[in-house]
Amino acid sequence: MRLIDHTQASLLDYTCAQLGCFFPSGDGAALRHRLERHLPQALARLAHCIDKVRMWQSGQFNYLNSSQYCLYLYFLANTVWREEGSEEAVGAATRLFLLNKALNGIDLFYEIAMPEVFFIGHSVGIVLAKATYGNYLVLYQNSTVGKNHGVAPVLGEGVILYPNSAIIGRCRIGANTTVSQGTGVINRDTPGNCLVFAGTAGELTIKAAKRPLIDDFFRF
């Protein structure tokens, strides 16, 4: 994957400089060495994701594209935590998570198992719990996936959450479900291949999808 205006070394320097600015500490050299070990794997995961998104140029990563940089920080944090799990690795992953929150306004913890391919339209206000996420997920601003009394949703493949939507609690969201703007799905299931709208008296209106909207977002 081509890194626009960067090499792997300079991208690492850039990331470490941001971490040092926001979360200064005395372990800069050790942090850089740790991130350097995991950067190639994180970039490989990022490349696979970018190549599947229709609106992005395949084979290149632009660090000034805030949505792409948001994914980069998640993949790097998750890779560091997943591959090591030591106290020092947790510290590095935590700083990357907090940097992502500071720069992009997203609450995406490094322990969350995001799918291999997902797209963030606008990251501001997105809050994601430790739920089960299917591949080809689409998230827009102020969308939420959360637990209710400790129970997290299960999302199938090809789920789209438009702005200000939410999936909360004991939900099984069928594949290719689109949750419309401002709609909250709370302790409810959806059949899949459908559009979900806010109805009256807290009920949902569910309509069959005329075509797979997910095709607008991804290359299959």
Task: Write out the residue ranges for each language-model feature.
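A short glycine-/small-residue-rich loop at the edge of a beta-strand within enzyme catalytic domains
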Residues: 67, 128, 150
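Conserved short-loop catalytic and cofactor-binding motifs
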Residues: 60, 64, 125, 147, ...
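Short, positively charged
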Residues: 89-90, 111, 150-152
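Terminal amphipathic alpha-helical/low-complexity segments used for targeting or macromolecular assembly
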Residues: 1-104, 208-220
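Short, flexible active-site loops
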Residues: 73, 77, 118-123
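Glycine-rich hexapeptide-repeat left-handed beta-helix
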Residues: 148, 155-220
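A structural motif detector for beta-strand N-caps
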Residues: 106, 112-118, 124-126, 131-132, ...
